[in-house]
Structures are given as C-alpha cells and as structure tokens.
C-alpha cells in the first residue's frame, strides 16, 4: 500500500492519570529517554500529517510547555473539562477550524509502544477499503477487560465494539480488541461528533459512539490489525510503565544486535531511544545508555557503566564508569570507577584511571591520569603523565580558573595545581608539590617544605605507648649489635 498523508493527527493528552499516583501528568512520565506523549508524537510524525494537534487538559501548562519543547510544530487544543474522548476530539477539530477534509487519525497520548509503521498501515487500510472509520485492533492472548471487536461474518466489516462487561459469552471468546486508535473521514467525523449523546453512566461523549452513528447512516466501519498486540498497550499505572519499558528496551536492543552490536546481557542493559551504535560495539551487563550517547565501531562499554549524552569513539574501553556530556577518544581507556562530567574530552589512546574525576577538561593523545585524582577546568597536552592523588584546584570560592599542562610532562604524586597556572612542555613537578606559579618548559618544580626529623620525640611525648616500645626495642637491638 502506498503511504497516505493524513489531513490531521489528533493526540489525546488531556487525562489526569490518577492511577499513576503522581504529581507529574501521566503523559509526561519518562520511558526510555522520552515522555509517553513524546513517543506517540514521534510515531505520529512519521505519517507527516498536514496538521498535528494535541488535546491537553489536566496540568495543561506543564503539558503544553513540554509539547513545545519536543514537537514545536504541534498545535494544542484545550479540553477545559474532561468530558470524554468524543469531546476531546471535537476540541481538536475546533482548534483546526472545524471539519477537516481528508483522513483524521486519532491516537491516545499514553500508548508509547505504537509505531509509525502501524499508523501508516492504519491510514492505508482506511483509504484502500473506503471506510468512514477504521479502528486499529489487535489479537491478544487474554482479552479480559477489553472492548471486543464484533465483525460481520460475510464482509468482515466491524459491526460493533462491545465492552467486556456488556459482552455475551460468545462475544467474550473474541480475542480481537479495540485499541482506541482510529482513522476517520474528516467530514463524517465532524458530523457524527455533533450527534454523540451523553446519556451514559459517565455522562461523557464517547468517541466509540461515532462508529455506531456512522454505521447506522450506512457508512462502512473497518479495522486494521496491529502486527504486535503489545503496541496498543496503554499506560495507566507504574506496573504497566515498567512493563512497557521492558518491551521497548528489548525492541531497541534487538534492533542494535541485529545491526551488529553485541549485548552480553540484554536483561540488565538499558538504552534510550536516542542512543546510537556502530558495528562491533560490545556492551557488558549492568550498562545504562541515555540521551544522545553514541558508541562508535569496536568500542567496549561496561560492566556497570552509565553514559549520558556521551560519545565513545572507535576502539575505546569504558569500564565501571559514570559519564555525562563527555567525549572519549579513539582507543582511550576509562575506569574502572571513573567519573567524567560535562565538557570532558579525552584524546587518542589516553587514559582516565581508577577513582579519577574530570570536569570541563581535555587531555591529549597518549596522556594518562591513572589514579585517585580530580581534574577540573584543565587542558593537558599529549603524552603527559599526571601522578596519583593529584588535584586541580580550580575554584577560589567565587570563580572557576583554568590550569594548563603541556605535552610530555611528568607530574609527581600528590600534587596540587592551584589555578590559574601553567606547566610548560616537558616540565616535571616533584611529589607532594603545591604548584601556584607557572612552571617553565623543561623545568623541575619543587614546592614543598623540607623534611625535619625530631629524634626521640615519641619517647618524650608518648612514653609507654606501643610506638615508644617498638622504637626502644629497635634501639636496644642496635646497641646489642654494637
């Protein structure tokens, strides 16, 4: 079937979602790096509709602000009172000036597993079959609680959607269910919505009543069956949110593995929809990949690693690390137990080792920061080694300052670099130094007090202590040797 461009997609996002038991509107809850409604908008966007409208109601200021951020082209319609799905769609049409010529697709804002391909198939089936309305359905293993799709035995047309509580025994045996997603003829939809009544137990305008109105008027009501029944699942509570996260995560990891990524343990690996991979990446157990993280060809990440908005280049290794907004260069080595904060850039074959934290710093090719160090607001050249337990003192209590260390430098253990300060190319610094002044290229900087040994201090100040007795024993042994 050829692609059909709908005249409009209406996303229903006005509900409160009380079963989520949250101050956050239901459609704004996060799932694999995107809000529930964000997933729906992404799927709807694949249809390239002429108009994209979201109907908001509960906490509409928050929802509208979020929509403007994630889908700038979306138009919002306000449902002041939640008077049912039919009323919500009517508000959506009014936001577009009333009746719309062409196909109108209606989707729920809490169905994040719905794909663009399924919506395309719905629109194509609707047009090809000449339906007034086409409902997206699915065959499920257990239809308990769902509205059943009743079809005409001869034509296959949908004759009714029967809610579970109203279904007969034979109807309850039906496993084809209503998803709440529809494609309508825009003009017929507008006309039928004007005839929807509120004489029901909820006193609301039901969108499903439109199907009966159109059928009674002699129009055809059809169906398009989703290939995977899990796509139509709505999210109403945290349990369903967790299940949807598992399903979507599995979908994302399966796609990555089929594209040449090794995921050692998919059950403990979690990714966002915005994460990208190249071939021959290896992801170890306990890894979380978020935001715009990108893993380049042949790199290896994990175990127990969390990367957010971080790029790892080809052949790099990142182990037991937390990184946010960092860039790990080709064949670089990070971890274990490293923390890379925003603005950190690591060069070719560089190393950030065990218990090292780096922030807004760059290190050049072959440079190593192997152990127990903090590097903040610094630039380090190529092939330099930073000694263990070094601290780049960047903050004076009011402002941040920059440290520059050149190429081919060797800095001693337990150094402090008090910014702003520069260490020139090829310079050395002695262990235990506090570097407060610039070090010229090729120099050795020693900035520490001289050692002074006070003989007999322990015996005088700590008489009778274990230390004093140990020292006395050594002294007696020495006297005996004499």
Swiss-Prot record:
Pfam families xref list: NTP_transf_3 (PF12804)
Alphabetical keyword list: Acyltransferase, Cell shape, Cell wall biogenesis/degradation, Cytoplasm, Magnesium, Metal-binding, Multifunctional enzyme, Nucleotidyltransferase, Peptidoglycan synthesis, Repeat, Transferase
Residues binding UDP-N-acetyl-alpha-D-glucosamine, per UniProt: 12-15, 26, 79, 84-85, 147, 163, 178, 236, 341, 359, 374, 385
Superkingdom of origin: Bacteria
Active-site positions on this chain: 371 (proton acceptor)
CDD domains reported for this sequence: GT2_GlmU_N_bac, LbH_GlmU_C
InterPro entries given in the database record: Bifunctional_GlmU, GlmU-like, GlmU_C_LbH, MobA-like_NTP_Trfase, Nucleotide-diphossugar_trans, Trimer_LpxA-like_sf
Binding site for acetyl-CoA: 388, 394-395, 413, 431, 448
Region ranges (Pyrophosphorylase): 1-238
Compositional bias ranges of the Low complexity kind: 464-473
Compartments it resides in: Cytoplasm
Family statement drawn from the similarity comment of this UniProt entry: In the N-terminal section; belongs to the N-acetylglucosamine-1-phosphate uridyltransferase family. In the C-terminal section; belongs to the transferase hexapeptide repeat family.
Name of the protein in its database record: Bifunctional protein GlmU
Organism listed in the record: Streptomyces coelicolor (strain ATCC BAA-471 / A3(2) / M145)
Lineage: Bacteria, Bacillati, Actinomycetota, Actinomycetes, Kitasatosporales
Gene: glmU
């Amino acid at each position: 079937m050829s692609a059909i461009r709908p005249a409009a997609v209406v996303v229903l996002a006005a509900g409160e979602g009380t079963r989520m038991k949250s101050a956050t509107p239901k459609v704004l809850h996060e799932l694999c790096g995107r809000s529930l409604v964000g997933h729906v908008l992404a799927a709807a966007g694949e249809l390239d509709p002429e108009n994209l409208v979201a109907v908001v109601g509960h906490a509409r200021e928050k929802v509208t602000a979020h929509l403007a951020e994630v889908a700038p082209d979306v138009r919002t319609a306000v449902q002041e009172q939640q008077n049912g799905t039919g009323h919500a769609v009517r508000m959506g049409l009014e936001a577009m000036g009333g009746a719309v010529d062409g196909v109108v697709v209606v989707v729920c804002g809490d169905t994040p597993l719905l794909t663009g391909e399924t919506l395309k198939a719905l629109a194509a089936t609707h047009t090809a079959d000449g339906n007034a309305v086409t409902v997206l359905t699915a065959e499920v293993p257990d239809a308990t609680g769902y509205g059943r799709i009743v079809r005409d035995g001869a034509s296959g047309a949908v004759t009714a959607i029967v809610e579970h509580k109203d279904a007969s025994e034979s109807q309850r045996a039906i496993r084809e269910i209503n998803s709440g997603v529809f494609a309508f003829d825009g003009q017929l939809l507008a006309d039928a919505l004007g005839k929807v009544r509120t004489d029901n137990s909820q006193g609301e305008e039901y969108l499903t009543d439109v199907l009966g109105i159109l059928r009674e008027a002699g129009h055809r009501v059809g169906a398009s069956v989703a290939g995977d029944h899990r796509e139509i699942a709505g999210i109403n509570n945290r349990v369903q949110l967790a299940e949807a996260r598992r399903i979507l995560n599995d979908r994302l990891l399966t796609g990555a593995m089929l594209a040449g990524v090794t995921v050692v343990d998919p059950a403990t690996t979690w990714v966002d929809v915005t994460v990208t991979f190249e071939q021959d990446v290896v992801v170890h157990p306990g890894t979380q990949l978020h935001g715009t993280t990108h893993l380049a060809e042949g790199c290896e990440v994990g175990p127990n690693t969390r990367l957010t908005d971080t790029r790892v280049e080809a052949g790099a290794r990142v182990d037991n690390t937390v990184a946010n907004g960092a860039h790990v260069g080709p064949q670089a080595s990070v971890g274990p137990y490293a923390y890379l904060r925003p603005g950190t850039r690591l060069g070719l074959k560089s190393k950030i080792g065990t218990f090292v934290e780096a922030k807004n710093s760059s290190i050049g090719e072959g440079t190593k920061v192997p152990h127990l160090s903090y590097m903040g607001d610094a630039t380090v050249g190529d092939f330099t080694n930073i000694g263990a337990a070094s601290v780049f003192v960047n903050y004076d209590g009011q402002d941040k300052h920059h440290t520059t260390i050149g190429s081919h430098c060797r800095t001693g253990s337990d150094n402090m670099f008090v910014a702003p300060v520069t260490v020139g190319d090829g310079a050395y610094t002695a262990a235990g130094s506090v570097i407060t002044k610039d070090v010229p290229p090729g120099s050795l900087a020693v900035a520490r007090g001289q050692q002074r040994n006070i003989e007999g201090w322990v015996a005088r100040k700590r008489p009778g202590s274990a230390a004093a007795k140990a020292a006395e024993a050594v002294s007696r042994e020495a006297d005996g040797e004499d």
